[in-house]
Amino acid sequence: MPIRRSPITAAIALSLLAFSALAADLAPEALLKKAEAEQKPYLATVEQLVNVDTGTGQEPGLKAVSALLVERLKALGAEVETSPASPSAGDNIVGTFKGTGSKSFLLMVHYDTVFLPGTAAKRPFKVEGERAYGPGVADAKGGVAMILHSLKLLQDDKFDGFGTLTVLFNPDEETGSAGSKKIIAELARQHDYVFSYEPPDK
């Protein structure tokens, strides 16, 4: 995952602008500056997530990361609900924020990976030059962290220009989302805009 200032800060800023475009008092330049300051804590969150094995079906790691995500969402002020992603291991996590606007947004990404148990211990998160490495660093724990830190910056700015802002973290995307596709479809139908934080193929 590239960690040059511009890709990370631009991604966070664009994530913020998706919502802040609804509010005239949030200037893009100011958001970019805040996003630049958020790079270090963002990478710390990525490291925390990457260093736990969450291969699809690996219940201990999925449970640990699920607890962390629930804690982080609640700290940001979300109303949080979890439900088993049966027949998959792990929980679907839904965090909901209520605002003063009219439009609804869904932010979604998975927190499982394709890696075997023990991979995180063998090659933990590291930064070399302008790249970060580790199991799931791009697909998609970087996206999980992107959502959390975008929400933090919105909260810091006291921005509530949305009607409903919903976050969905699912634990089984890498094997087809058997235990989460239903809730994904249901939530998508309920929102005006849906943002997936899955990385592009290239």
Predicted regions: what they are:
Residues P2-A11:
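Bacterial N-terminal signal peptides that target proteins for export
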Residues R4-R5, P135, K141, K152:
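Basic side chains
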Residues A11-I12, P41, P117, G142, ...:
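Enrichment for repetitive, rod-forming helical segments
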Residues A18-S20:
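N-terminal signal peptide c-region/cleavage motif recognized by signal peptidases
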Residues D25-P135, Q155-F162:
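Acidic/His- and Gly-rich active-site-bordering loop/insert found
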Residues A140-K202:
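Acidic/histidine-rich catalytic neighborhood of metal-dependent amide-processing enzymes
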